[in-house]
């Protein structure tokens, strides 16, 4: 199980190997970006299969980056994605991928099918440039930039570009204070966050392995640039110039490229424009070779398409939503200690009331359906509620887990077997599930018999299905505490039905 922890800036030096070799050419997968924006985005991280997994939180929702290996190991990244799917399934978090590189789109569509919502928002796309173009500003297309640089050089003949070292920190901070006093919109939350991140990162330039240079004119710092090399790309995290110093921006951009963007640097990533009109115009004037998409993928599960509970008819039974008038009967089922011992759910963990009203149990399962956690259906023999069958723990590759409980007076009549078969047929044929799982403790002979019988029935009824059976060790999480019962020591039976 993945363990996401808050990404502190002190973690980043240890994580640098993940960023240094990445060839995605996206600014999001870099130490400088995460240092400056990680607090704002409430970034957390985990490691699995030799990969780094990142998670942002925005408006109460989680957004996961595509796993990043240190050496571009696609197989390891897919295994890490498996772990992420299991994490989301177990923690009931939605799998929403963000900042996905374009080259990962096709494998993800193949992995999850067509039931995806994909977006690629224009204002967050990174501007990617040919590094040689910035070094030389060649040809007629860059005549404007060359003219601005020539004007700067003519106006400030004593200009010089220097690499910044630790002893230059006071001068850099003084420059930023002058810049901040006049040149950014303090009412813009993103601009304010970016400015604070700029101040914060300067003392950590060497620690993060960043490149930093400043342009001086008349002995005064007039422009500053900070970048980070990731693979064959230099990502420009900071570029500031004082207002009134004509030509300082194209001059510092060129000087930085000539100083740091050689020896295998093919591209310069100047990040996004955040939807700022002036910034967009400026970035386009430098003629990007590509606007690098950052794709967002919301992966849908089979349950997400349901707006109301279904009704399933079998030979003797009806599986349907439980109405208000059956709240007392359902409460009897929900309160049955022996049944709940095997059910894997302790209602006492969901309420502080020692003796909740009957209606509470019904509202509890309705809550779970509204939040797309499960499909709970009452098992009806005629008009009598005799049990419950549930599809739950929905995964992101068309899988779910099934469970059922039948009142003692109605057991040993084949009801559990028939209800399981009906629910599985619905899951496979109507919901489009590819895999249904069932678990039970070996002491629970009633459920074990029903599962074995349902396995035989489903195989006969749906010949395209291939049954599979294995052995697993169930943990304390698989069942609620019960007097004298230690489920962690019980070896249970795991059944899985998968479409061929």
What are these regions (language model features)?
Residues 210-298:
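Aromatic (often tryptophan-rich) hydrophobic motifs at membrane interfaces
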Residues 119-136, 269-306, 462-479, 493-495:
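Active-site/acyl-donor-binding loops of N-acyltransferases
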Residues 28-103, 216-245, 391-397:
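Conserved donor-binding loop and adjoining core beta-sheet/short helix segment
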Residues 230, 268, 300-340, 376-500:
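Acyl-donor (CoA/ACP) binding surface of acyl/acetyltransferases
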Residues 90-101, 262-271, 429-439:
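Conserved GNAT acetyl-CoA-binding A-motif
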Residues 104-118, 274-291, 417, 442-459, ...:
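Conserved active-site alpha-helix within GNAT-family acetyltransferase domains
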């Amino acid at each position: 199980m993945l363990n996401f922890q808050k990404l502190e800036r002190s973690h980043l030096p240890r994580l640098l190997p993940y960023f240094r070799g990445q060839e995605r050419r996206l600014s999001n997968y870099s130490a400088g970006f995460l240092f400056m924006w990680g607090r704002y985005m409430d970034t957390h991280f985990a490691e699995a299969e030799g990969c780094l997994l990142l998670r942002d939180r925005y408006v109460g929702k989680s957004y996961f980056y595509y796993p990043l290996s240190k050496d571009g190991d696609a197989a390891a990244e897919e295994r890490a994605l498996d772990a992420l799917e299991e994490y989301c399934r177990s923690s009931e978090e939605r799998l929403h991928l963000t900042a996905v590189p374009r080259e990962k789109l096709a494998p993800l569509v193949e992995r999850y099918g067509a039931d995806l919502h994909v977006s690629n928002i224009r204002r967050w796309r990174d501007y990617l440039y040919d590094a040689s173009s910035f070094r030389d500003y060649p040809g007629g297309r860059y005549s404007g930039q060359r003219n601005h640089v020539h004007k700067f050089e003519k106006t400030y003949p004593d200009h010089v570009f220097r690499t910044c070292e630790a002893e230059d920190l006071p001068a850099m901070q003084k420059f930023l204070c002058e810049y901040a006093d006049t040149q950014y919109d303090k009412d813009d939350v993103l601009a304010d966050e970016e400015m604070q991140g700029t101040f914060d990162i300067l003392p950590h330039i060497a620690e993060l392995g960043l490149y930093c240079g400043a342009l001086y004119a008349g002995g005064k710092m007039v422009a500053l640039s900070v970048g980070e090399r990731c693979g064959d790309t230099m990502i420009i995290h900071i570029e500031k110039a004082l207002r009134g110093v004509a030509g300082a921006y194209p001059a510092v951009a060129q000087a930085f490229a000539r100083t740091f963007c050689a020896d295998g640097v093919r591209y310069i990533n100047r990040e996004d424009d955040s939807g700022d009109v002036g910034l967009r115009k400026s970035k386009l004037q430098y003629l990007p070779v590509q606007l690098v998409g950052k794709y967002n993928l919301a992966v849908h599960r089979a349950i997400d398409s349901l707006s109301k509970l279904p009704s399933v008819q079998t030979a003797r039974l009806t599986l349907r939503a439980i109405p208000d008038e059956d709240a007392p009967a359902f409460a009897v089922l929900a309160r049955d200690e022996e049944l709940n011992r095997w059910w894997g759910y302790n209602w006492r963990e969901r309420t502080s009331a020692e003796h909740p009203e009957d209606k509470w149990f019904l509202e509890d399962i309705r809550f779970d359906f509204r939040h797309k956690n499960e499909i709970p259906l009452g098992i009806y023999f005629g008009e009598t509620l005799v049990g419950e069958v549930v599809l739950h723990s929905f995964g992101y590759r068309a899988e779910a887990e099934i469970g059922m409980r039948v009142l003692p007076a109605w057991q040993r009549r084949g009801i559990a077997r028939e209800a399981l078969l009906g629910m599985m047929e619905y899951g496979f044929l109507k919901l489009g599930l590819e895999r249904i799982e069932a678990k039970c403790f070996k002491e629970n002979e009633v459920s074990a018999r029903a599962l074995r019988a349902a396995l035989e029935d489903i195989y006969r009824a749906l010949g395209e299905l291939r049954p599979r059976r294995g052995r697993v060790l169930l943990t304390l999480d698989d069942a609620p505490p019960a007097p004298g019962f230690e489920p962690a020591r019980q070896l249970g039976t795991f059944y899985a039905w998968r479409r061929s």
